[in-house]
Amino acid sequence: PTLCGLETYAGVHHLVSVVTGDLRDGLDALDLLEGTFPGGSITGAPKIRAMDIITEIEGDARELYCGAIGRIGFDGALDTSIAIRTVFMDDRQAVLQAGGGVTLLSEPGPEYDETLAKAERVFEAFA
């Protein structure tokens, strides 16, 4: 297990936590997935009200963005990651979703700059 481990990538630092545990009897990996996503580090708290506000502001459901990408093993093990800085493509366009961690003390200008910095590396991959 890791709590807020710092990982450094080209152009961005990222805090990563690894959580392990055992499910109560009668629950499976799908119950765990339903109970933990979207991740609290993405939504804020309280989670349900925060997601209501996010939907009001953004106008659409996030779908895969900030959802789970992962696998469920034949042994019932669940291994997931939160889909951030995600590109959705169809035959006509590519749409990039990225963001920063807004808090009560956040200032719009620096938050916007952080979002652009995070998205820049993805843009470069398409250049």
Residue map of PLM features:
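Metal-dependent catalytic core segments for phosphate chemistry
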Residues: P1-C4
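Conserved hydrophobic core element of enzyme catalytic domains
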Residues: T8-A127
